[in-house]
Amino acid sequence: MKFFIDTANLDEIREGVELGLVDGVTTNPSLIARENLPFEELIAEICKIVDGPVSAEVISLDAPGMVAEAKKLASIDEKVVIKVPMTAEGLKAVRQLSAAGIKTNVTLIFSANQALLAAKAGASYVSPFVGRLDDIGVNSADLISDILTIFDNYGYASEVIVASVRGPQHVLDSALLGADIATIPLKTIKQLTKHPLTDKGMEQFLADWEKRTQ
């Protein structure tokens, strides 16, 4: 399973890379807005840090606008993947971008039907949002399972990026189901390293060692 880090903060990305756990980066307009650098400059800086896909999202609502933005973003670096919203216009854009050899990540997916349409349009990645579904009482694990089954049934090459991850349980669920990728904040990456029994064991080992050296 691959881990992408869900942030546009350069320091967080560097820290994740230093841990050896980051295979790519996902950003969105909200994350970009928190940073001080201009959008395209920020994406270029991220691409220098990470040896993997970097998702950058278009903000146009119509297909021609999305395609124009996408081509500009894709020219920044070959690592750039274009995030496109799951709309009818978005699907038109994905079809055109796919034909032009530009990789796409269809975002804001909340149903298996949406994922199916994105894959059929030629999306390189689809991003179902698990946390937001769980927030409204929908079992997001069922969605991931359905998407993976559909893609397997028809041999779609689109990779599933589990997004809107709230914590370690979402990562575990995604791994158990066989999702290709989870995109997660640095905070959650750090949480994955923790277990109270690990901390307790370390404390005991150190205490025993100190007794030995006294």
From Swiss-Prot:
It catalyses: D-sedoheptulose 7-phosphate + D-glyceraldehyde 3-phosphate = D-erythrose 4-phosphate + beta-D-fructose 6-phosphate. InterPro entries: Aldolase_TIM, TAL/FSA, Transaldolase_3B, Transaldolase_3B/F6P_aldolase, Transaldolase_AS, TSA/FSA_arc/bac. It is found in: Cytoplasm. The active site is at K83 (schiff-base intermediate with substrate). Pfam families: TAL_FSA. Keywords: Cytoplasm, Pentose shunt, Schiff base, Transferase. Transmembrane segments: none annotated. Belongs to the transaldolase family. Type 3B subfamily. HAMAP family: Transaldolase_3b. This is Probable transaldolase. It comes from Desulfotalea psychrophila (strain LSv54 / DSM 12343).
